[in-house]
Amino acid sequence: MIILSTNDNLTNPYEIARYIKEAKKSTPVRAYIQGNIEIEETEELEVYGCDNFKIVFGELEVVEKLLEINKDKIKHYRLEYDRRNSAIPLLDIKHLDARIEPGAIIRDKVKIGKNAVIMMGAVINIGAEIGENSMIDMNAVIGARGIIGKNVHVGAGAVIAGVLEPPSSVPVVLEDNVLVGANAVILEGVRVGHGAVVAAGSVVTEDVPPNTVVAGVPAKIVKIVDDKTREKTKLMEDLRG
């Protein structure tokens, strides 16, 4: 199994792809088993329960073998699983100093800054970084190695392209205080400058200068950020912390 260390260059799409290809694939399952069966806990099986009822955690092939061997002793069983041949585990979020809502999918090797907010249905891929006080809204996607600065809002359904497929050595970067509207798309390698605003539904194909507003398909500069724009796009601190 290939382990991607903290020293590996996650901006290299081919290194990430190699890691995914060579990683041991996992299909973890949870089995609820009713029957007169003795199950010994091993390195491959985690077992809970009493005489006639067991809850077993393990890889699919190991648990299925257990069920087949003991099929004459089992009255009922139920298998639950949520992935198949998964190459990258999900991030351990329990000690993050951030708000992670149910249904967010965050893969391993992701960095989440203090007081960040990850909403329901958001997807954050391997190697991405989310800065302090930034919000990734519902159903937004942050691709592999996407770099999100501090005090950024990525609107619902927005897509921040990753460095994988098509491969790109340069990640998307949203600098501090950027706002990306709902359903906007930021394509591979684009850098959005400090304080810029990307209008909802825009497709950004080129770098965005700081403190500008871009809109359209493809996105073009429509104005400079002014006091009225700042008022309309300001973040709500009560949603953070």
Curated annotation (Swiss-Prot):
Listed Gene3D superfamilies: Hexapeptide repeat proteins (2.160.10.10), Malonyl-CoA ACP transacylase, ACP-binding (3.30.70.250)
GO-annotated biological processes: diaminopimelate biosynthetic process; lysine biosynthetic process via diaminopimelate
Role noted for this protein: Catalyzes the transfer of an acetyl group from acetyl-CoA to tetrahydrodipicolinate.
Pathway as given in its UniProt record: Amino-acid biosynthesis; L-lysine biosynthesis via DAP pathway; LL-2,6-diaminopimelate from (S)-tetrahydrodipicolinate (acetylase route): step 1/3
EC number: 2.3.1.89
Organism annotation: Thermoanaerobacter pseudethanolicus (strain ATCC 33223 / 39E) (Clostridium thermohydrosulfuricum)
GO molecular function, one term: tetrahydrodipicolinate N-acetyltransferase activity
Enzyme class: transferase
Catalytic activity: (S)-2,3,4,5-tetrahydrodipicolinate + acetyl-CoA + H2O = L-2-acetamido-6-oxoheptanedioate + CoA
Keyword annotations from UniProtKB, A to Z: Acyltransferase, Amino-acid biosynthesis, Diaminopimelate biosynthesis, Lysine biosynthesis, Repeat, Transferase
Family in the record: Belongs to the transferase hexapeptide repeat family. DapH subfamily.
Name of the protein described by the UniProt record: 2,3,4,5-tetrahydropyridine-2,6-dicarboxylate N-acetyltransferase
InterPro entries tied to this protein: DapH, DapH_N, Hexapep, Hexapep_transf_CS, Trans_hexapeptide_repeat, Trimer_LpxA-like_sf
Pfam families hit by this protein: DapH_N, Hexapep, Hexapep_2
